[in-house]
A protein has these predicted regions:
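Surface-exposed loop/edge segments in extracytoplasmic proteins
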Residues: 107-114
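Hydrophobic membrane-insertion alpha-helices, especially the h-region
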Residues: 4-19
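A short beta-turn/strand-edge loop motif at beta-sheet boundaries
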Residues: 90-94
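Beta-strand signatures of extracellular beta-sandwich domains
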Residues: 99-101
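Short proline/glycine- and polar residue-rich coil/turn motifs
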Residues: 116-122
Length: 157
């Protein structure tokens, strides 16, 4: 009985440890195109695009709290929807439970969660939910929910 309990504890601790530490050694590269935003807006119709995208603002990521982050983030409007786009030069230290948030003037807003980070490298598109007032924010954050720590931030100008 005692050996079973010890084995179960070791398995649980090992699993949690792997979940927390493995992202530091694993990179996930994403390669989404800007055209995918237009396709989504048009409902995946195969005809030539009639919807145009407009870059509203952009900024460069900087790492925070000892983490590395670099690359370009853009706020893009397509039709009546807004998107955050990370360009191909984007990279951030990988970690557990990373999410994309919006923030303002040096503070991320926990109520402005966009989506979980698709990968720690490469071009990515994130649709901003209609419930979020884009005009209230001027920053994009990569935030680790598990440890409540910022990995990177881009100020949008």
């Amino acid at each position: 009985m005692k050996k079973s309990i010890v084995a179960i504890v070791i398995i649980i601790v090992g699993g949690v440890g792997y979940w927390l530490i493995s992202p530091l050694f694993i990179d996930k590269k994403v390669n989404e195109s800007i055209e995918e935003i237009m396709m989504k807006q048009e409902g995946n119709k195969p005809q030539p695009s009639m919807v145009t995208s407009q870059e509203i603002s952009s900024g460069t990521f900087a790492g925070l709290a000892g983490h590395n982050a670099e690359g370009t983030a853009k706020l893009i409007r397509t039709g009546d929807k807004y998107y955050i786009r990370f360009e191909d030069d984007f990279s951030v230290t990988n970690g557990p439970d990373l999410f994309v948030y919006l923030g303002k003037d040096g503070r991320y807003d926990p109520d402005a969660r966009i989506e979980s980070l698709k990968g720690n490298m490469g071009s990515q598109n994130y649709e901003i939910p209609g419930s979020i007032a884009v005009s209230n924010y001027n920053e994009v954050w990569v935030w680790c929910r598990a440890f409540s720590v910022a990995f990177g931030k881009a100020e949008l100008n």
